[in-house]
Amino acid sequence: MNTLSQNPSLDLVEFVETQILPQYAAFDKAHNMEHVTTVIRRSLDLAAKIGADLDMAYTIAAYHDLGLSGPRAVHHITSGKILIQDSRLKRWFSQEQLRIMKEAVEDHRASASRAPRSIYGKIVAEADRNIEPETVIRRTIQYGLANYPELDADGHWQRFMEHMNEKYSANGYIRLWIQGSENERKLNELRQLIAEPKKMKVHFDRFFAEETAGE
């Protein structure tokens, strides 16, 4: 257990940084080394804030997307299997800890309809999200352009706002797992924009123009 230090165990960090993290170099831009190191940093911040085991939170974050070596739709399940089957982790963790860690990795997907089974699942699910308003706006526009090429600018705006209301508004389906997190503050910023479509349209128009420039 490692709840007293503000950092995970040095030998565990050395193992993860040399044996685990390099695997992310093979994944797409949204799940690359920059992504996993961001999830690790956020996980450690949340774990320290709530007094969770830093070694567990660190390792869960490091393994959470390894399943992207296979089909994306089940990558969270595959990632959990990779973690539980890695016998090298027994050097640092008990079988019970590893079971909790496997379940946390399985529960990390933000689209999961049920709550993560433990605080560790909640930590990695929250750390894996990016609710920075400008990032959400840009990604939603990018998704619309890629998947609905037949829509004109007005059509994209309508689809964009439908998605914003459905997922991120006060009545949306997004659920935050840890109160007082950075994500809670960012979600409130986004909700203020959703509640004022004229302000949101200014952001939409700017990013839409950037994403369609040169077409």
Regions found by a protein language model. Name each.
Residues 33, 37-40, 58, 95-106:
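Short, well-structured alpha-helical segments
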